[in-house]
Amino acid sequence: MLEEITSLDSYEAFINEICSDENYVDPHYLYENNNLYCAFERRDQHVYVNIDGGNTDGIFVLLILPTEKYIEMIVGLSKSKHAYNELFQYLENNYKGYRCDFVINPKNVSLKNILISKDAKFESEQQLMIARFPSHKQYPLDIQLYTEQWKQAYIDMHVKEIYWTAEKVLSALDRFRVFLAIHQEQLVGYLDVTYAYKQNEPYSLIVLPEYQNLGYEQALLSKAIQMNGTNTMMTLVDVNAKEEIKIYEEAGFDVIKGQNSIFATITI
């Protein structure tokens, strides 16, 4: 039975068991265990436990946004097909028609198989990369923080088919910085990146095709890392995207072994 909880005090043994198993540990927990432990303090996040025969077999943190009909599984800790089935039954009973996103451990066959049975759409496996310091390499390019004069050019260039559209980013500048690449008074690229957390991440990095491979991607990222101060920065890159991985490495990111993930989405 799935039920919402307000404390994890009784579940540390279960959490440690799941998170010590490389086949089932949740990627978001590995990135930052406060994705689990601070969930109770975060708006619109809910923590559920599944109990089977008196034993805990699943803990799930869900971000639920009713006005947008959107759910994200922030953390999912379970080895049990039964627990995942209970989770999906709960979602189907209460949130029919919602979009639900998952970031899963590629080795978690139990969850992956259930998502396949739900006709989930999967993206490619992602490589985790972390930056703690910017590259020492200098990029003599014009990189600026967003200002209103670039609003329309930024909106026009921005990727449209994502949750964090240009308009949403600009309405959340308490957590996002927007860096702009300028060439001869024209916008040629941008980077959306969070800055309000101990571990921040780029959300969208775009450089116009004719300006790619000139260092703009690295310059945008390097500037963001520099302004990130003592915080770390993480990103996920397609494991087969060797050129993209190289760009991030040149900007100051390191490949982190053993922490890959896969994004999946369903309509409930």
Question: Where are these predicted regions, by residue range?
Answer:
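Conserved donor-binding loop and adjoining core beta-sheet/short helix segment
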Residues: 29-87, 189-209
